[in-house]
Every structure is written in C-alpha cells, then in structure tokens.
C-alpha cells in the first residue's frame, strides 16, 4: 500500500478514510484532524489557557502533544485516583512525559486532597467503580481548571469513546446526556469550557500516533473497569465497523450535526437551577453536590484507605 499523499510506502491504513499513510503524512493527518475539530466546533480561542487532563494513557498524552504542536498554551493535569499499582504506574508515565518535554504538570492526589480514593468511593456509593471514578474526575478536573485560571479543560475522549457513549445514551434515551453530548460544553458560572479535540481520531489512530512519535504510555487497562457497559458498546461498534468502515464516524458526526440540537433544551434545563454547593462551592442543583455527598459517605468507611487502595 502506498501513502495517499506522497506515494511512499504506507505504515498504516485508515479504513474509514480508505487511505494509507507513511509515518510523516500520518502524524500530519492527526494534527489536521485535531485542528479541524477545534476549528469546526470553536473549541479554543486565541489567548486561551488550556488544561489537559492526562492519565498516562495514549489518548491524553497524545492530545497534549498534538495541542502543543498546534501552538496552543496547554498544560497537563494528573489526578491520582488511588487504584493501586495501576495509578502508581499511570502517574509515572504522565510525569515522565511532562519532564521529557519540560511542560508544566499539575498533580492532585484524590486521597491526600479529599480524604478518599476511587476504591473507597465506589464502596461507599455502592456502585460500580467507574461511577465513583467519573464523578470524582469531573469534579476535580473542573475545580482545578477554574481555580488555576484556565479557560479550557481538554480531555482525551476519542471517536471510539464518544460513539460508544452515544450508543448507550440512545439505547436508554437519556435526553439530558444526549443534550450534553457534544465536542464542546460552553463555559458557565463555575464551569470551564470543556472540549474533546480527539473526536475525529479513533483509538487505533492514536495508538499509531504515539508509536510513531515515540510517546511512552501505559498500555494496561484500568483493573476496575471490568464490567463497564461502555466496553461492551465499543465491542459492538467495532464489529459493525469491521464490516462497514466509517460507521462509527457517520453515527457520531450525524448525531452532532443533525440530532444534538433536538436534545439541547434538556441539557440547558439541567443547568438553569444550579446554586453553589454549601460545602465546596461547586455548582449543583441541590444544597450539597454529588461529589461532596460521595466524600461524606467515603469518610464514614472504616477500612484503612491505603490498604483498600492496594487491595
């Protein structure tokens, strides 16, 4: 196979584009896809300070590098979730990447800062770990961005991630979630603008980008993610994509272009009646935000924190 652009030998084929690329042209393709996502959805404005949530994985580290290559003022944020050796190794990859490039990395440890970690939070909430993890990350990410004066919070959600989430929301007709499922969530009082610049790149493309640009990342999946239904949705979409390349992109982009607005009012309604949390000040529809309620439940657990994190 030849590179679509320069006709040199291709190192990767991107089936949904029906194209192969050499290493140099492929990395340029990745930059162009991110640039297009940013421009099409007005994600980042001139002079914006961007905080990139990094986990040590391919998507977030790749995103940080791509934003820097495109000239954006982007710093990193790593949140230690207390998931045993997995969190320890993830932090090592994030720190090594930041040190290699001499880029600022803000670090927040969930246990040290808030008194609990994901394993204890999951047990306290009596839910699957991903629920406690997602709630905690959303709160800490936004708080870090707002507190430290960043205009934009960027996350490494890619095309595969967003298509799987969309499938789950459609299967359950989650109107509020469908109204918020967009590459950009605008800034609001107490909220930084949230953007997903990788929405035009799939997991396989990002893995290839990291290999070709020598980004060292943690390969292992989170050990607490077993049973996450979105992994099942991803597998379903992968099977469809194998038979019909481009289906995931058509599904997601079709919704963004033609379906998202139909649910926009449901999302707006959920943000109209927000007030400051009585404990942390974060916007919430009730007196106490969900994160602070989780924190209170976790504090009531009697199991030693570090022991549970390492279990």
Question: Which sequence ranges carry the predicted segments?
Answer:
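Short, low-complexity, intrinsically disordered N-terminal peptides in bacterial proteins
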Residues: 1-5, 9, 304-311
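ATP-dependent adenylation/nucleotidyltransferase module used to activate substrates
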Residues: 2-180, 184, 188-191, 200-213, ...
